[in-house]
Amino acid sequence: MKPIFSKIRVLGTAALALFLTASCSDILDEQPRSSYDPTFFKTEKGVEGGVTSMYAHLRYIYGQAYYYNSCLTGTDEATWGWSADGNFKDADLSGVGNLTATTCRSDALWGTAFSNINTANGVIENGAEVGVNESLVSEARFFRAFDYFLLVQTFGGVPLDLGSGELKFNITPSRTSVRNTVPEVYTKAIFPDLLTAIENLPANPRVTGGVTKTVARLYLAKAYLTYAWWLKNPNNIPTYPECQRTDPDGHDAAWYFQQAYDVAVTAIENPGPFGLQESFWMVSAGPNDRNMEILLYADHTQEDEYYNGGSLSYGGGVLPITLPDG
């Protein structure tokens, strides 16, 4: 019987080898659905998804408590309450806390804005290649300018190079960065993006609460006005990084004040679907929260926490808070 067992072992080994060879001949074609890699931006669906995420990112700024904390704590408008921790005490005017670079809640804006800026970079770089209309790409241009405008008002000069070059989509982790000056942020990023957006965006929103020419004009007028005041600097407020308060294009504060006025007038004379409400009550009434005065918003749902982006019953500080009215 020994030869028979030997033959069985040989045949079994050969069969196993044949099975392994056949099973490993094809490379597994992965189709990840819970996460995305940078090549997703090389597809039309990826570009469209990137633009959609930019509306959602508004919730993670204006819908989270720590952003408002970073705006109000440390002023005479608010103080810490009985259950407050260091998030609220550290920046309080009373000096009850210890404010440092690691205890302030500036991350509420910094982290959210820069991740969205990189997404916008990816959309802008790849949009034309995958055949997406420039009007959709200009929505990304608007949001990139939107975030840089928030950042430059809060921190002064901030990096335009996230690791792959100025205003380039970055996929390489980096622990260092170089902060551009305030004039560079305005003249290289904010103004060009908004001007291009105005030229290509529609008068009527593509989606409910979406970006339009009127919205872009509003932010361009605000950016011109803010930059003009920075150039004028009547109170001699220091800036960071230190730089001369001169415009790279040779314009002075008066020129930018005039530009702000002209853009605002154009927006008023060409409002699109927007207009003023008849009374302040109509602006503030809960059932009327999608009225003609609302130029931009990220809508939410009170039916599904996944699509809402935050709890429908609990406010945790970081996640968007959209609790039921009442």
Model-derived features: where do they sit?
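Bacterial N-terminal signal peptides that target proteins for export
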Residues: 2-12
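Bacterial N-terminal signal peptides
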Residues: 12-21
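Membrane-proximal, proline-rich intrinsically disordered regions
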Residues: 24-70, 100, 280
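Conserved, well-structured interaction surfaces
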Residues: 44, 48-62, 83-155, 172-210
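Elongated scaffold/linker segments in the mid-to-C-terminal portions of large proteins
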Residues: 45-46, 51, 55, 62, ...
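Short coil/turn linking the two alpha-helices of tandem helical-hairpin repeats
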Residues: 152-153, 159, 205, 223-235
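Short coil/linker segments at helix-helix boundaries
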Residues: 157-179, 183, 230-259
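TPR/TPR-like (Sel1-like) alpha-helical repeat modules
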Residues: 258-269
